């Protein structure tokens, strides 16, 4: 009787927990007696993982927070590596969190354990030398986006493009009328979604700018309505403060970014993963971003890509306008977005084509790739 497969996984944040649980579910269909060890969140635990420690201990953002927790993070990683070497899983899968997981992969591969990294870090854009560490530490890279796979192929890293789970869950056609009815918005009114980011710094830099642009749009289209999904109670309080003294017809939502995107005609949006959601909902957009001047100056010299937004990176052309730093003025944002409220067909046709490329049943693709690496059958 053959020994059940043992799969080790480590996820460091909520998005990784979603990906990990989907992969675990797909693997269980193929091998019902499979065993999972490692670190995950509530979704991965619901699929049968007993997490060595709470995933939240790895969820740190920003240099100051990382430095404050560095001793703990290094100690946890050292203990995790030793535990996994002793357990000898059939494969280790690091899910995103590259600053934590890539080093684990390198040490485990040297110890003779096969390694997979799920979700590429942005090595194609900056710090490209990281690909050398990935090539040394990783038996297989699973990417969510096709241009990432092409990059790894050129660098000699074994890779499989599995598609994006969001493209699987968001339908090819979304229904604006139902979303508007749920929000109490008139069906005939033009609606713009304002999405200035999910972090305090982003909202601080972009919130007032977006509201200035919204006032200019409203002056030209008096019937215009706005929706703004707030990522957290803290962001909602921040947005409410920025709105004081303004007479904008804006509906604030707690979360519900997908509802806002389904309901709107066009989006004014911060560069980031939300632009992919807007693309999948086929909503024409203008992308804006501002950073601290020194940060922007440094990144401009480090980043190798001609584009910053995911829609343009996926299209490999300027599909959506990008207004960055000093170019992101209220006047420029309003002027660029206004025609898209009524006619964004040039963008949305491209969005539909990209959605179909990304819609590949990512969890099942990833499961098949992992089992293929192990020389196992992926028959369901």
From Swiss-Prot:
State the Gene Ontology terms under molecular function: lipid-A-disaccharide synthase activity; phospholipid binding
Give the GO biological process terms.
Answer: lipid A biosynthetic process
Leading EC class: transferase
Reactions that this protein is recorded to catalyse:
a lipid X + a UDP-2-N,3-O-bis[(3R)-3-hydroxyacyl]-alpha-D-glucosamine = a lipid A disaccharide + UDP + H(+)
Extract the InterPro entries matched here.
Glyco_trans_19 (IPR003835)
* Documented EC number(s): 2.4.1.182
Q: Which keywords belong to this entry?
A: Glycosyltransferase, Lipid A biosynthesis, Lipid biosynthesis, Lipid metabolism, Transferase
Its pathway, per UniProt, is: Bacterial outer membrane biogenesis; LPS lipid A biosynthesis
Quote the cellular component terms of the Gene Ontology held in the record: membrane
Note the Pfam families from the entry.
LpxB (PF02684)
- Please give the family membership noted in the entry: Belongs to the LpxB family.
| Function description | Condensation of UDP-2,3-diacylglucosamine and 2,3-diacylglucosamine-1-phosphate to form lipid A disaccharide, a precursor of lipid A, a phosphorylated glycolipid that anchors the lipopolysaccharide to the outer membrane of the cell.
Protein name in the entry: Lipid-A-disaccharide synthase
Q: State the organism of origin.
A: Pseudomonas savastanoi pv. phaseolicola (strain 1448A / Race 6) (Pseudomonas syringae pv. phaseolicola (strain 1448A / Race 6))
């Amino acid at each position: 009787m053959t020994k059940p497969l043992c799969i080790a996984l480590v996820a460091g944040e909520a998005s990784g927990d979603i990906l990990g649980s989907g992969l675990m579910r797909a693997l269980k269909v193929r091998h019902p007696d499979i065993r999972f060890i490692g670190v995950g969140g509530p979704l991965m635990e619901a699929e049968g993982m007993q997490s060595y420690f709470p995933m939240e201990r790895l969820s740190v953002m920003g240099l100051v927070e990382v430095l404050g927790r560095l001793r703990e993070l290094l100690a946890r990683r050292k203990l995790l590596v030793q535990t996994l070497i002793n357990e000898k899983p059939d494969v280790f899968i690091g899910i995103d969190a590259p600053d934590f997981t890539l080093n684990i992969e390198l040490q485990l591969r040297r110890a003779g354990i096969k390694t997979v990294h799920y979700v590429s870090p942005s090595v194609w854009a900056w710090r490209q030398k990281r690909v050398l560490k990935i090539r040394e530490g990783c038996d297989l890279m699973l990417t969510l986006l096709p241009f990432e796979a092409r990059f790894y192929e050129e660098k000699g890293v074994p890779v499989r493009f599995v598609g994006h789970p969001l493209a699987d869950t968001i339908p090819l056609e979304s229904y604006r009328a139902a979303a508007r009815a749920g929000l109490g918005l008139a069906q005939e009114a033009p609606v713009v979604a304002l999405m200035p980011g999910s972090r305090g710094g982003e909202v601080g830099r972009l919130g007032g700018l977006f509201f200035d642009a919204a006032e200019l749009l409203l002056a030209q289209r008096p019937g215009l309505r706005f929706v703004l999904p707030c990522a957290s109670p803290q962001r909602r309080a921040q947005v409410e403060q920025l709105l004081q003294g303004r007479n904008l017809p804006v509906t604030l939502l707690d979360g519900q970014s997908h509802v806002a995107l389904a309901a709107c005609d066009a989006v004014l949006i911060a560069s980031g993963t939300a632009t992919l959601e807007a693309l999948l909902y086929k909503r024409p957009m203008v992308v804006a971003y501002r950073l601290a001047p020194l940060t922007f100056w440094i990144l401009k010299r480090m980043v190798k890509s001609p584009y910053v937004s995911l829609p343009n990176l996926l299209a490999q052309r300027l599909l959506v306008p990008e207004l960055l730093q000093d170019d992101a003025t209220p006047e420029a944002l309003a002027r660029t977005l206004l025609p898209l409220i009524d006619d964004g067909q040039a963008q949305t046709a491209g969005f539909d084509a990209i959605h179909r490329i990304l819609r590949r049943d990512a969890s099942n693709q990833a499961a098949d790739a992992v089992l293929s690496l192990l020389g196992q059958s992926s028959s369901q």
